[in-house]
C-alpha cells in the first residue's frame, strides 16, 4: 500500500482503492476445486511447511464463503457445467487460479475427446500456474501474483 503522506499528528493519507485492495489481498478465502494430482500439491501448500494461512487464506468448503477458486487438475467435459455453476455461486469480487498443465490447456490429455482444453473456456482465469504437477512454491508464487493484481485493480470501476 503506497502512502501519499504521513504527518507528525499521526494522520495518514491514501486512496480508498489502496486501503480496500490491501484488505482484499490479506483475506483471500480459496475454495478448492481439486480434480487430479495437482490437488495434492494444493493440500501440500496448506500444510505446515508452506502454511498458506500466513497469507490470511483459509480453505472454505462452500462457494458462498469463498472469493478465490483454485482449479487444480484435469477438467473433463462432464465437470465443466459444475465448475461454471460453482463459479456463479461465488460472491463478487471473485478470482480464479488455474493450477497445472491440465487445467491450463488440457496438459497430457489435450487431445482426448473428454477433456476441456483449459478451464478458461468455462470460467475467466486471473492467474495461470504452470507445471505437471506444479509445486507448492509455484502455487504460492501464483497467489502472490494474484495479490499484486488485486492491488492494481480499480475498486470503483470493477463494482
From Swiss-Prot:
Function: NDH-1 shuttles electrons from NADH, via FMN and iron-sulfur (Fe-S) centers, to quinones in the respiratory chain. Couples the redox reaction to proton translocation (for every two electrons transferred, four hydrogen ions are translocated across the cytoplasmic membrane), and thus conserves the redox energy in a proton gradient.
Reaction(s) catalysed by this chain's protein: a quinone + NADH + 5 H(+)(in) = a quinol + NAD(+) + 4 H(+)(out)
EC number: 7.1.1.-
One GO MF term attached to the UniProt entry: NADH:ubiquinone reductase (non-electrogenic) activity
EC class of the enzyme, as a word: translocase
Coiled coil ranges: none
Entry protein name: NADH-quinone oxidoreductase subunit B
Keywords annotated in UniProt: 4Fe-4S, Cell inner membrane, Cell membrane, Iron, Iron-sulfur, Membrane, Metal-binding, NAD, Quinone, Translocase, Transport, Ubiquinone
Membrane topology reported for the UniProt record: Peripheral membrane protein
Cofactors that this protein relies on: [4Fe-4S] cluster
Subcellular localization: Cell inner membrane
SUPFAM superfamilies, per the entry: HydA/Nqo6-like
GO biological process, one term: electron transport coupled proton transport
Gene: nuoB
Complexes and interactors: NDH-1 is composed of 14 different subunits. Subunits NuoB, C, D, E, F, and G constitute the peripheral sector of the complex.
CC cofactor note: Binds 1 [4Fe-4S] cluster.
